Amino acid sequence: MQEPATHGDVIEQPLIKVSAFWRMFPAGMRRRWWMFRPFDLIARHFPIFRPRKGLLVVRMDGIGDMMLFRQSLEHYAEVFGVDKADITVLGCDSWRLISPKIFEGYKVITIDEHAYARKLMYRLRVNLMVRRLAPKITACDSYLRRAMMADSLVWVSAASRTVVSMPYVNEPTRSEFTFYLSQVDEVIDTGPYPTHEILRHFRFVSTVAGKNFQPQPPKINWPDQRPALAADGPYAVINPGSNEPGRRWPFASYVAVAEKLLAMGWRVAFVGTRGERWDAKLLDDMARRPGVSDLTGRTTLPELMDLMNHAGLVISNDTGPAHLSIALGAPTLVIVGGGHFTSFVPYPESACPDNARFIYKQMDCYHCFWRCDKRASKFEVFPCVAAIPADDVWTVCESLMNEYQSESARPMAAG
């Protein structure tokens, strides 16, 4: 994959300017936007009587997107001329439990982003809280973002300086993005779709700074809390779930790989949320096998981090825990579909750590944005995911295990 230069471009603001009349009565807005508008205005103009200070970084991301962003944050203090202690990350409740370690040294506030986009009174409370932060600078470099979430929060902060990246815009979202982008100070073009998110984040800080920063892969310095499972020899963590049913590699294929691991004397732990037990009977049958632990719905996010941190192998669909596992340094294989291929996975060569592997089956219909027309229902696995053979996955697993015979995965039998 060709990788763009690290440095991006600042979009000239006249290109996104609109008339005062259009800004007062913008066309093409959703009914919900109009419902929220008077309350957003109240929050934006709520009187604040203390000096503005610090930097607010808006990250309405899932866990995986947050991890792809995390390394670029280390440059924000230098780039924006603020102390690290004066940087506040506004993020999502989904990663609240691990944020004290992931963002050590930064202030972190998390919200329920879905409630923010739907519930009027919750939104008003959050907006007033953001306004009271009184940041001097607000920044947001998400590409695949929602205007009524991320851009609304940037707008409500009413910071003295606002810097955002150019988002992915289509016709249904054009009016909303135009409204918000026309009112920020700087818009950074981080590259065309499907530029990888890691490259985007580093292009953003490079453009603001006026100098290049080399992209860095995700990395977490996680406390060494050895889980009970690690006491009895090597084990693999299998994460077969996803909040998008189509991204779930067939569970029977995961079972086939698990059988090979068990035959080698390894143990297998299935993880995920309780709602992701999408093939419960097959999972229950597997859980009765010696050496198999069904931990779905039974671990907190920090406990899952501990499990992956000591695993000899992690196999996962394209979902948040896969990025966490890679950042922990665990040998990780990610099973990838083509919805927005190369935007998030696989990682670009310049920012791909040695412990990460990605497997996929290229198809002509890649880059469908997960709007697949080749399945009968939204609960079926995407064909590009289902087409990945279990034998191919096992071949990559063997390679990873041979390369990473860590303390938690010493004795290895012949396959």
Residue spans for each PLM region:
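Catalytic machinery of carbohydrate-active enzymes
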Residues: M1-G415
